[in-house]
């Protein structure tokens, strides 16, 4: 429908005034010739990249990873750092829990010599460091481990047993308002790792909730619920964890998908095992009995041997990874390897108390 000529002139004058006052690009039509595609960074897991729909975690946004203890939260975050560093990006790790193991990080592929690390004394200090790094425009990925460890200054200076109702929630709410715009302008990915608590007196529904108030839930573009669902064994020895990640919230693609992969102790996400599973599912790898073949050549008997073959031949693994991403991410018609969750699947941390 055509706009009245007088209105058109008034709108043009208003837009001109806004751009003059706030800068070019401060307001524009949504359909203008400007790429709306979101730049992403791989999570280190092919199946999780596919479940996210865009091929990874979005730059310029806030992401929350939460789950029970020893479920793989920090491992997943470190894998994101390793993937970002391989692309030449600068990363920072805000270690509020004072528990980062540099030896383990190095095993996961993190370049610890070029990783910025801070162990702040208070929650306010941690969030101010995040804001300063973001405003510099020079840092691409920031990890905060964890929200539960971001202790307000008043609580640290007070006595144990003192009541500090809602302090952490207010601190996080203020930080989200301040950080969201700066992250977008700097195109910086900020990942918050969070812990789970139990709500008291919940008779029906999920009693689980996350710490730090409700603000993080609203500002996060992606929320990932990570759980350990089993053990990976080599004979009788446990060598890793079977892990499931649910995409609880997703603003860049369809939510409620999930991915399953293995986290091997001392190695991280078993990407080669994922390549074998997805390759078989999408008929890029042939499976006859226990034997696996790629392009007519046998690559191993059993999944473990096939995975080892890909590990020893990174060029073939990269070729297979590229084919799967083209098939499943770039508008391909391949069947999605990750099924949408059922209608009963609910956000595992739907309502958050303000103080824990």
Curated annotation (Swiss-Prot):
Binding site for ATP: 67-74
Designated name of the protein: Protein RecA
Keyword line: ATP-binding, Cytoplasm, DNA damage, DNA recombination, DNA repair, DNA-binding, Nucleotide-binding, SOS response
One cellular component term from this protein's GO annotations in UniProt: cytosol
Stored InterPro entries: AAA+_ATPase, DNA_recomb/repair_RecA, DNA_recomb/repair_RecA_CS, P-loop_NTPase, RecA-like_C, RecA-like_N, RecA_ATP-bd, RecA_C_sf
Role of this protein: Can catalyze the hydrolysis of ATP in the presence of single-stranded DNA, the ATP-dependent uptake of single-stranded DNA by duplex DNA, and the ATP-dependent hybridization of homologous single-stranded DNAs. It interacts with LexA causing its activation and leading to its autocatalytic cleavage.
Predominant location: cytoplasm
Sample GO molecular function, one term: single-stranded DNA binding
Upper taxonomic lineage: Bacteria, Pseudomonadati, Pseudomonadota, Gammaproteobacteria, Enterobacterales
Cellular compartments annotated: Cytoplasm
Superkingdom of source: Bacteria
UniProt record, GO biological process: DNA recombination; DNA repair; SOS response
Protein family per UniProt: Belongs to the RecA family.
Organism for this UniProt entry: Yersinia pestis (strain Pestoides F)
